[in-house]
């Protein structure tokens, strides 16, 4: 894994990153994808954390991406519990299954922890994230608003 670099995403990277996300998620969970559009819109959200938006480069080419947002969980007692959300993390299709995703995930989580992240919720493939210790939010009584337990 020579010439591997993870750095903060720059505005000049946005188009390349959105194309990468589209390629990475195309026809994975549904016909086509919308993750690239979601990222495009989230960057303008007040809860977007630019300091925690990363790209992974291999020999100067962007092959991976991850980002974080501020969020809250509304507790049953009415409290707001500050958390972060993450993703979608992605790796270029030709580099999937080679350990790059795990490297990017570990790096991203360490930076988020340094930034003050104490809890994290996101949607993703449990087969990938479970290897890093993640489990279902429902195990902690966390659910989408309005959905039954």
Residue ranges and their predicted role:
Residues 129, 134:
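Conserved active-site tyrosine of GNAT-family acetyltransferases
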Residues 18, 25, 29-67, 72:
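Active-site rim helix/loop that mediates acceptor-substrate recognition in acyltransferases
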Residues 123, 135-149:
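Conserved catalytic-core motifs of GNAT/GCN5-like acyltransferases
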Residues 9, 124-125:
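Conserved acidic functional residues
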Residues 1-12, 19:
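Conserved N-terminal entry element of GNAT/NAT acetyltransferase domains
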Residues 95-107, 117:
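Conserved acetyl-CoA pyrophosphate-binding loop and the N-cap/start of the following alpha-helix
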Residues 110-124:
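Conserved GNAT acetyl-CoA-binding A-motif
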Residues 78-93:
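Conserved acetyl-CoA binding element of GNAT-fold acetyltransferases
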């Amino acid at each position: 894994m020579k010439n591997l670099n993870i750095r903060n995403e720059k505005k000049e990277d946005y188009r390349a990153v959105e194309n990468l996300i589209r390629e990475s998620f195309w026809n994975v969970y549904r016909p086509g994808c919308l993750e690239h559009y979601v990222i495009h819109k989230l960057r303008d959200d007040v809860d977007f954390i630019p300091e925690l938006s990363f790209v992974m480069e291999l020999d100067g080419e962007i092959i991976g991406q991850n980002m974080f947002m501020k969020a809250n969980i509304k507790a049953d007692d009415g409290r707001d519990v500050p958390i972060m959300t993450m993703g979608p993390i992605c790796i270029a299709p030709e580099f999937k299954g080679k350990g790059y995703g795990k490297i990017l995930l570990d790096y991203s989580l360490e930076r988020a922890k340094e930034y003050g992240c104490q809890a994290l919720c996101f949607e993703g493939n449990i087969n990938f994230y479970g290897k890093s210790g993640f489990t279902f939010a429902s195990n902690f009584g966390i659910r989408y608003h309005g959905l039954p337990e």
